[in-house]
């Protein structure tokens, strides 16, 4: 579920990175992402940022999943933008902190497996291209 960063910036509109952040895209396909604490990033006018006030009640990493699902239900897209007002109006039910931790742990393991599988496919594609280049050029 987590996305690779793109682009580099020497500054950010944020100056406090001591808390984790949940980001969502305003334009295009509906996407939600988690940025860990102390990880620098620069939000643009094409995304929104949520900072959980109390991680003892709601885990930021957990919030990514129900926010993703709710955005899909709302059919957020380029035509139906996920403005801060629309995000603010969402009602998301969250289970106990123990259940949130369990969900995060299980899904993090699966996300890691997906990441490894994507890397395997990328490596295989590169190996295939190298063979094609060697014998067909």
Predicted regions mapped to residue ranges:
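A short beta-sheet element
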Residues: 2-68, 72, 83-87
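Generic preference for flexible, low-structure residues
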Residues: 16, 38-40, 66, 79, ...
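A general structural signal for well-ordered secondary-structure junctions
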Residues: 72-73, 113
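A short linear hydrophobic-aromatic micro-motif
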Residues: 74-78
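Amphipathic alpha-helical coiled-coil/heptad-repeat segments
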Residues: 93-137
